[in-house]
């Protein structure tokens, strides 16, 4: 009969503290300097941007930032095409082929600019096409780019 190995509870290391500090500083920055803005996406950017070391942090932060930028601009363009056909917005079947086209273009652009941008770019693209309305799709996209940029910068400090 084998004896079970004792499981060691993971410790709180410097990377753990740095991640928590980055997210917390983002929230504090928004509350103090940008009180009308929601800090959630900046905090998410800070957490996603943190890696095991500086090289990994740049990679993860770049994935998140470039994905948000590519998906944001692509989503704005495709949603604008949608609004030409359906000016009132809403959910129409046209969104399905636009999503297909968008994902294909997203992957091509990610291969050109930043390979890891596909997943975060896809999230922003889907949100813009299916969850954000015609009145605020541009501001939503630009806000996500700004907030993600703030979070990624905080994770690299």
What are these language model-derived features?
Residues 1-122, 130-157:
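Alpha-helical transmembrane segments and their membrane-interface boundaries
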